[in-house]
Design a protein with these regions (language model features):
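Non-heme di-metal
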Residues: 2-8, 13-16, 21-22, 26-333
Length: 333
């Protein structure tokens, strides 16, 4: 029997034992849901600059003052459907928080201490993981709903009254968010795996739900966007407090500069995140509004501004009178 004291084993085996003992740890390190913050040089090296086309849905220019005034709002559920949608998004949010190691601060003490020393403490890599997960899911509802409404229009031989355009614009916008952040961080293979799985499950569930209950789906997305605005507000507060120093030197990717035309090479990561939050706030308003109207007969109130009236109307800007969604009686349909 070979002993550890055997000269042959001591010469040949100890290094092997050491290497074997290290392998599980190295493998365990890869089995994490995480995203690596790329250095600026790495981002430039992997930057895709070939055959860049102009955005299909040009983004409106927003000033710093406009994006800074965006705040979290909540639409109080009024019907059973509203309550069901809110419960659904609360359940999804809870699972998402656990998966990404996130906890929403609720007290001044939690905001100040940021859960330091606990699994809930957020750093640059964890923020990127959460954002990329969020944006990979957020781009599904608009495209799925637009696809279904497109088929309805073809099958029923009638106009869609401009819902499709707004839904496609929303999906395109969310995808631009994702394309921007993957230029800043590199997700691990396990993170990508859960993105694949999450998209497959969510897309199919949303597809069938939209066929049956489109109003519920728009309310669900409205509450989802409420959570997105809340998350980005938390990130913005951490950035302004200097809690995430690695983000200070991040260069805004070219794809973001081309989409948000007011951004340039001197823009900061904070400038970028404020515009992403503003986008989410607009999706929040739009989807809550669409959930309030007749899904089959009413027009999309964001597609056309009615002339010759002093009555306030929805618009694409951020200065909305109803950030939590317009009621049907306030609209010209």
């Amino acid at each position: 029997m070979l002993s550890i004291n055997n000269p042959i084993v001591s010469k040949l085996g100890l290094s092997g034992l050491a290497s074997v003992s290290l392998r599980p740890n190295a493998f365990a390190r890869t089995l994490k849901i995480k995203t690596e913050l790329l250095e600026n040089n790495d981002r430039r090296k992997h930057n895709d600059t070939k055959f860049i086309s102009h955005p299909m849905f040009p983004h409106p220019e927003w000033t710093n003052e406009e994006v800074e005034m965006v705040t979290p709002t909540h639409r109080v559920p009024k019907s059973t459907m509203d309550k069901a949608a809110l419960r659904a998004i609360t359940s999804v949010r809870t699972l998402f928080d656990i998966a990404t190691g996130y906890k929403k601060p609720k007290t001044p003490e939690e905001i100040a201490h940021r859960f330091e020393g606990t699994r809930w403490e957020m750093n640059e890599n964890k923020w990127l993981t959460r954002i990329i997960f969020l944006e990979s899911v957020a781009g599904v509802p608009g495209m799925t709903a637009a696809f279904i409404r497109h088929l309805h229009s073809l099958r029923l031989l009638k106009r869609d009254k401009a819902w499709i355009e707004t839904l496609l614009d929303e999906a395109y916008n969310e995808r631009m968010h994702l394309l921007t952040f993957i230029k800043i961080g590199k997700p691990s293979w396990l993170t990508r795996f859960f993105i694949y799985m999450g998209q497959g499950v969510f897309c199919n569930m949303f597809f069938f739900m939209y066929l049956l209950y489109p109003r519920f789906c728009h309310r669900f997305v409205g509450y989802l966007e409420e959570e997105a605005v809340s998350t980005y507000t938390h990130l913005i507060n951490d950035l302004k407090a200097g809690k995430l120093p690695k983000f200070d030197d991040v260069e805004v990717p070219e794809v973001a500069q081309q989409y948000w035309t007011e951004l340039n090479e001197k823009s900061t990561f904070l400038d970028l995140v404020e515009r992403v939050r503003a986008d989410e706030s607009k999706h929040r308003e739009v989807n809550h509004t669409l959930a309030n109207v007749d899904q089959k007969n009413d027009r999309n109130p964001y597609a056309l501004k009615i002339e010759g009236t002093d009555k306030p109307q929805p618009e694409k800007g951020l200065k909305s009178k109803h950030p939590e969604g317009w009621e049907k009686e306030d609209l010209i349909l």
